[in-house]
């Protein structure tokens, strides 16, 4: 009997020693959506899919304007692509603080404060980290109260508000329904009430607008008053992510998404009749006069399926380049896929893929192909076709899409486009042309 008791005691002790300790760290805080607190789960081995509807912990842009979306210990860079561990880019977050989540983040825009301008700030519990060009600044991390006196710990969101959007260079902090405007020069804090806004779980400034994320939706707001104008909230996956299919939408919903999406274009072209076709992910937008149409690429170009690298129009046909293949469709209703295609890009145009953009200008038979900063010409009437380098683009490191029309060459980079009178002007230009917004000036989005 005593032997059995002794064995039982040994077994109990071994189990208690083997059992992992419970993680007692609590990041919940009052006022967060979802009850008593908003829990940040650890996802170290998780495969996160932002198209399934993720509530992000923080959103910010880097010094090159690329959005960073944080969830748990993961980070999404840009509008598409897989998540990666945050400590791959910001290793010190783990060195100084076991990284379970980032509470809030923003990139400082304050030209009057060179010590802070273009720095990225990350907030974890009661600490703040300052990075410049992905390197942790000396003496960081610091207590939030030391850098931003009067601002509470365990924040929900933060966003910069530079002049003239705010009267002075300011940072707006969110915690539950409490809003704090922090003046970067005087260190003064003004508490405000944004009655028409939901509680933000993330916030960021993008293309001159201010966005509050709540769940997988967002609202555009006035940084001074918190007023939300227009039809909000909207679905974040429609405007800030490249997601093929989710939910049910009307025809108008599809058109508005493609008009107003902040995700960069993959390709754009204008046919012989002057109609514009813009391609993004799994969808395309066509503009005929003042009429818009949107659908999936697969619905009208089923052999292509989705995601093109570049498209150009020539002699009543679309030449659609994807990886190292060329698909050709005769323009019409419906568009007709030509037999024998796809063919290798090398055989058709004499260049290896991938390419960034391609276009033919009116009444010409030369296709201009952009790859990196190089631009090549191919005479489409020549047999065999020969690739000739025309020049080097010096004003941009990379181009997302380009087309040529009555107004000259349109170059698309991210959410902006630039017009040049001709290819030669683009190659020789010393002064940057006016920067215009794709969603508004090109596609007529009203928000």
Curated annotation (Swiss-Prot):
Glycans are attached at residues 87, 168, 199. One of its GO terms (molecular function) is heme transmembrane transporter activity. SMART domains: HX (SM00120). The keyword Cell division does not apply. It is found in: Secreted. GO terms for biological process: cellular response to estrogen stimulus; intracellular iron ion homeostasis. The keyword Secreted applies. Heme binds at residue 293. Hemopexin repeats lie at residues 53-93, 99-151, 152-197, 198-243, 262-304, 305-351, 352-395, 396-441. Keywords: Glycoprotein, Heme, Iron, Metal-binding, Repeat, Secreted, Signal, Transport. Residues 22-44 have a biased composition (Basic and acidic residues). Residues 1-18 form the signal peptide. One of its GO terms (cellular component) is extracellular space. Residues 20-44 are annotated as: Disordered. Belongs to the hemopexin family. Binds heme and transports it to the liver for breakdown and iron recovery, after which the free hemopexin returns to the circulation. This is Hemopexin.
